[in-house]
C-alpha cells in the first residue's frame, strides 16, 4: 500500500504546464478531509497551500502549493489539510 512518501512533488516542465492547461479545474476552500485515491492523480497547483499526511501518522506529511506539480499514487489513503484555498488542474490515470 502506498504511503505519503510515495507522493511526488516537483516544479513542472514547460510541457507539463501546457498539458495541464487542458485538464479540468478543481477548487476547495480551507478545510480538512480524508481521501482515498482509486486511481493515480496528477495535478498542477495554481493557487493555495496544502499539507497531506497519512491518517495515523500526522508527523509524516508532504506540503505543496502554487506552482507545484504533484502526483498521488493509486491506493493512497491520506488526510488533506487545505491551509489556503486551493485551485488545481487535475487528471486521473
Tell me what each language-model feature is.
Residues 42, 60-61:
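Short, surface-exposed secondary-structure edge patches
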Residues 35, 52, 88-90:
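Short hydrophobic/aromatic-rich beta-strand segments that constitute the beta-sheet cores
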Residues 36-38, 55-59:
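Short alpha-helix capping/helix-loop boundary micro-motifs
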Residues 38-52:
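Short, conserved beta-strand element in jelly-roll/cupin
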Residues 1-18:
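Transition segment at domain starts
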Residues 10-11, 19-38, 64-66, 71-74:
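Conserved short histidine dyad/triad with adjacent acidic residue
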Amino acid at each position: 500500500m502506498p504511503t505519503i512518501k510515495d507522493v511526488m512533488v516537483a516544479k513542472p516542465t514547460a510541457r507539463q504546464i501546457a498539458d495541464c492547461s487542458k485538464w479540468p479545474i478543481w477548487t476547495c476552500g480551507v478545510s480538512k478531509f480524508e481521501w482515498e485515491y482509486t486511481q493515480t492523480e496528477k495535478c498542477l497547483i495554481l493557487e493555495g497551500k496544502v499539507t497531506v499526511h497519512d491518517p495515523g501518522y500526522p508527523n509524516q506529511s508532504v506540503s505543496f502549493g502554487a506552482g507545484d506539480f504533484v502526483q498521488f499514487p493509486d491506493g493512497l489513503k491520506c488526510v488533506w489539510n487545505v491551509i489556503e484555498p486551493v485551485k488545481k488542474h487535475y487528471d486521473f490515470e
